[in-house]
Regions:
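Catalytic Walker B motif of ABC-type/P-loop ATPase nucleotide-binding domains
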Residues: 152-156
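ABC transporter nucleotide-binding domain
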Residues: 171-257
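Conserved ABC ATPase "signature" region
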Residues: 99, 103, 108-123
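Helix-to-loop junction immediately C-terminal to a conserved catalytic motif
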Residues: 54
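Short, charged/small-residue-rich alpha-helical element at the C-terminal edge
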Residues: 223-297
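Conserved catalytic motifs of ABC-family nucleotide-binding domains
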Residues: 148
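Conserved ABC transporter NBD signature motif
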Residues: 62-75
Length: 297
């Protein structure tokens, strides 16, 4: 089967500031209707990369194709950008801000749709400087959608938000993706990447060091999930299971690609599961395996 044409294709992207290589030989393909996450610690090159993709900065070298053609000046008219740092005018209300952007870039008939999509209804008469961090981000997301973009850029969309606001924003972004929009985001949150992204490109020191779906990367670099049982379990019963297990110093570890099926198999053997725990790897563990450092270094 022929691979579908990517909506955005980047080859050998490089950005140098005097003696500093901020982006080093980055190549990416982003397919329509998917979410790609650039994941990495501060200073990894994520923001510089996305700003080049947004056409804010020119690359030192490399090519960028949009819908199969070299990126042109009209590119900005077809994309939406939610910046990491808000630049809202304090004295305007949410309604005034959204109306202004729609007047400049959008369709007045889209106002109600954007208000509903980004859950802004109760905030319309509130001034921008009275909004919480999560409310500001929802307004910024609505502004990024004003021109009905086919491609949306989100730079650290949930940084600084409390857990509930972060989860609410993710649900809105996930719904936007479900409507067929293509999303590229930067994040240093492995939870955000696992929740939103179909593909992630893990960056470190300006380079992509791993790329793929979160599930595939976790399996490739960290192996299976594991069920942990106390040493009191009768290991003779485990001999009949088609799973790799090992007795460690203070526990028994059973590796499995399907945790729920394994638990069901243990139950049929009348193994006491009251002391069971589950160890699951995540993208933080992948980054640690690749670099020896934590994502939040």
């Amino acid at each position: 089967m022929t691979e579908p044409q990517p909506i955005l294709e980047v080859k050998n992207l490089r950005k140098v500031y005097k003696t500093i290589v901020a982006v080093d030989d980055v190549s990416l393909k982003v397919h329509p209707g998917t979410c790609l996450g650039l994941l990495g610690p501060n200073g990894a090159g994520k923001t510089t990369t996305i700003e080049i993709l947004e056409d804010i900065f020119e690359p030192t070298a490399g090519t960028i194709h949009y819908k199969g053609q070299p990126r042109r000046g009209s590119f900005r008219e077809e994309v939406g950008i939610q910046f990491q740092h808000t630049s809202l005018l304090n004295y305007l209300t949410v309604k005034e801000t959204l109306r202004t952007f729609i007047c400049l870039y959008g369709d007045p008939e889209e106002f109600d749709t954007l208000v509903q999509r980004c859950e802004l209804g109760p905030l319309l008469q509130r001034r921008n400087n009275k909004l919480s961090g999560g409310q500001q981000q929802r307004l910024m997301l609505a502004l990024a959608l004003v021109n009905r973009p086919s491609l949306i850029f989100l730079d650290e969309p949930s940084t600084g938000l409390d857990p509930q606001s972060r989860r609410n924003l993710w649900q809105i972004v996930d719904q936007i993706k479900a409507e067929g929009k293509t999303i590229i985001l930067t994040t240093h949150s492995m939870e955000e990447a696992e929740y939103l992204c179909d593909e992630v490109a893990i960056m470190d020191k300006g380079r992509i060091i791993a790329e793929g779906s979160p599930e595939a990367l976790i399996k490739q670099y960290c192996g299976s999930s594991a069920i942990l049982l106390p040493l009191s379990v009768d290991t003779r019963k485990l001999e009949t299971l088609p799973y790799l297990w090992q007795q460690q110093k203070d526990q028994i570890r059973i590796d499995s690609d399907d945790i729920y099926t394994t638990i069901a198999a243990l139950s049929t053997l009348n193994i006491d599961l009251s002391g069971m725990s589950i160890s699951s790897a995540n993208l933080e563990d992948v980054f640690l395996q690749l670099t020896g450092r934590q994502l939040r270094d």
